[in-house]
């Protein structure tokens, strides 16, 4: 009995010693120049910029999952579109006088050119390898039916011809021509149906997860970069010297450590809002978030996949958010082609696919509850749309698919749950609160912490978004000759607009196409066909947009 007691006592002492050692380790404070919260494409892109701009800065990246690029950046959790407004009709709204506004489309395209240049530069440096593993040429098409929609697309095409960024786009109302471009879309369709399509050969499909993994793998080669997986941020506290102490829990062994950082970037996707609120900076009080998920129908049947090589976007129906437009897309995932159709909106209170059902509730505060209520009251059509989407049956989704693929067979398709997108709700002096489409960099006045909120266009514009962040929080350094020279080496068009400069546009497109292994055909002169005039449109209540 005495031996057993002694043995148990020894075990208890040993376990206590292990516990004390773990606590001692947790109390140790790690120091870093830059803390990147989240292992997605935004953190990876910012880290890559800073590695070139300030190679001596130490960086630490923390990710709560067991690997990087497993949430929104994962190729299966997003549509993989290189958003450049070549086919997305929501970026070219029709004005009340019938004219087409192209300002937003031009801005989106300019932004994607920055991303292409950033990726091409990383390929040349050996940071990104084998471009075909993450970006591939997939033509971008818009496709509509019905007289009003055909008239709209014709006018859109004519309006975009005024921009050097959209040269090379083709337009057709001929069934045979459109069938040649997208056989699945036309086979089995009523030959009398009035249809129209535009096609741009230089469209792209992008695997943002693969880009993220390669960027982070390159960062890991440096001794002053640390990646901590299965690590969740539990607290952020500003210190008297304007550094930050961030408490990070190890989800595998239950220990915690403090990281003292001079600059903190919150690039945690849907979790960014809650962490921004945790920081306590006053700028966070203006924001709330509302989660919307997305589902896609997926086909891997070779008879389907090999018969379709395009991303084909339609036009949102009346009363639906413009960004909700259905599309049938060629994707290249895990090294093989598949076809996706969707998205269909879903609802969950989670802010991340791997998040908590308490995310929405825990992010609601006395500061943002009223803006959220105002958005709900002012956007009944949006609420009605989301409810109708959640109620869709398997048959409803299949009927939606048949509008774009008339000869589709149910057995060729399965349903896939993609990622969560947290929509920005921002306090507004006039309306109380507004739903904001897009992404927004929120930072403190001192430039010591910044977060990226929002969802669209998201990953495809990671490079320009992180440029905006650098200018916002490192303004003095950005204006220095050293940083200016480095940024212009990374992004040759930095500080200039390509739109309107045909020679510069062609030069950058040719350069990035060659480096990234993408198709490039020098476009013909802009179409000089007289611009069609649309009839003035009756003013309709605007439906708030969301990202799926």
From Swiss-Prot:
Coiled-coil spans in chain: none
- Reading the lineage from the top rank, the first entry is Bacteria
Keyword vocabulary terms for this entry: FAD, Flavoprotein, Oxidoreductase, Tricarboxylic acid cycle
Q: Which InterPro entries match?
A: FAD/NAD-bd_sf (IPR036188), MQO (IPR006231)
State the residue spans of region: Disordered: 521-548
Q: Which coenzymes or cofactors are required? A: FAD
Q: In which pathway does it act?
A: Carbohydrate metabolism; tricarboxylic acid cycle; oxaloacetate from (S)-malate (quinone route): step 1/1
Keyword match Zinc: no
What EC number(s) is this enzyme filed under? 1.1.5.4
Q: What is one GO biological process annotated to this record?
A: tricarboxylic acid cycle
Short name of one Pfam family for this protein? Mqo
Ranges of compositional bias, category Low complexity: 530-541
The entry's family comment says: Belongs to the MQO family.
Q: Indicate what this protein is called per its UniProt record.
A: Probable malate:quinone oxidoreductase
Originating organism: Escherichia coli (strain 55989 / EAEC)
Q: Tell me the classification of the organism that encodes this protein.
A: Bacteria, Pseudomonadati, Pseudomonadota, Gammaproteobacteria, Enterobacterales
